[in-house]
Amino acid sequence: MKYVGAHVSAAGGVENAPLAAARIRARAFALFTKNQRQWRAAPLKEESITAFKRNCADHGYRPDHILPHDSYLINLGHPEADNLKKSRTAFFDEMKRCEQLGLKFLNFHPGSHLGKISEDACLSRIAESVNMALDRTASVCAVIENTAGQGTNLGHRFEHLARVIDQVEDKTRVGVCLDTCHTFAAGYDLRTASTYEATLKAFDRVVGLKYLRAVHLNDSIKGLASRVDRHQSLGQGALGLDVFRRIMNDRRFENMPLILETKDATIWEQEIKLLYGMIKGAK
């Protein structure tokens, strides 16, 4: 079964995120468990945790179909010691919040070398950061998101993801979220049946489909190999609709969160309906 949703607002408290997801008829959702543009946040209140779990249960959202995303400020491969420590502290806090909410995943962007250290050194720091967070938590899986490769961000090559995973000690608690826009912008074509299959085979060969935990469903404003991260509504960008039709009919994407982060949140409900309508045999 396919579990499609969107990255919804948690304004007013995390307990509101499942309600926002239900309003757009989502079967999965993503959220920030704190303000994504601030380093610090007040601890989660017990009443918010209880209400979040109750609202998820009431609307049929299981933990494995919910994809929390960490703060955009965090850089787990930061070349400077003080900022690396700050990022690691914040990432650990995000992992703990996910545990408190009974969630299974934490989606994160790998990190950036900022032109100050080598790619290999940065990737090793990212893996070390993940290991430190996993050592201090019990159950949450660290889900690395592939990137478009904008600026000095790493994660745009499948080899980057593999190098991090290779250095993570607990392989049962690391996974990958593939973003269709990022994949395309990084130079992996998805537009035709043959290029779609070639890209997935490359991912399986280099990283392993066994590590795939989630997908971000986004069209791309920019073209193939642009290395620019600009999301577009489905079918309105350079990717087109065919890739999303293939994903919705591909058994490799069963039983995982398939999350919209498209440009216009006001049409997410229509996009979800569009995606489910793409399934062969759908009424």
Swiss-Prot record:
Cofactors required: Zn(2+)
Binding residue positions for Zn(2+) 1: H69, H109, E145
Binding site for Zn(2+) 3: H182, D229, H231
UniProt xrefs under InterPro entries: AP_endonuc_2, AP_endonuc_F2_Zn_BS, Xyl_isomerase-like_sf, Xyl_isomerase-like_TIM-brl
GO molecular function: deoxyribonuclease IV (phage-T4-induced) activity; DNA binding; DNA-(apurinic or apyrimidinic site) endonuclease activity; phosphoric diester hydrolase activity; zinc ion binding
Binding site for Zn(2+) 2: E145, D179, H216, E261
Keywords: DNA damage, DNA repair, Endonuclease, Hydrolase, Metal-binding, Nuclease, Zinc
Its EC number(s): 3.1.21.2
UniProt-listed GO biological process terms: base-excision repair
Top-level enzyme category: hydrolase
Catalytic activity field: Endonucleolytic cleavage to 5'-phosphooligonucleotide end-products
Textual note on the cofactor: Binds 3 Zn(2+) ions.
SUPFAM superfamilies: Xylose isomerase-like
SMART domains in alphabetical order: AP2Ec (SM00518)
HAMAP family: Nfo
PANTHER family linked: APURINIC-APYRIMIDINIC ENDONUCLEASE (PTHR21445:SF0), ENDONUCLEASE IV ENDODEOXYRIBONUCLEASE IV (PTHR21445)
Function: Endonuclease IV plays a role in DNA repair. It cleaves phosphodiester bonds at apurinic or apyrimidinic (AP) sites, generating a 3'-hydroxyl group and a 5'-terminal sugar phosphate.
Family note: Belongs to the AP endonuclease 2 family.
Protein name: Probable endonuclease 4
Record organism: Desulfosudis oleivorans (strain DSM 6200 / JCM 39069 / Hxd3)
Protein's gene: nfo
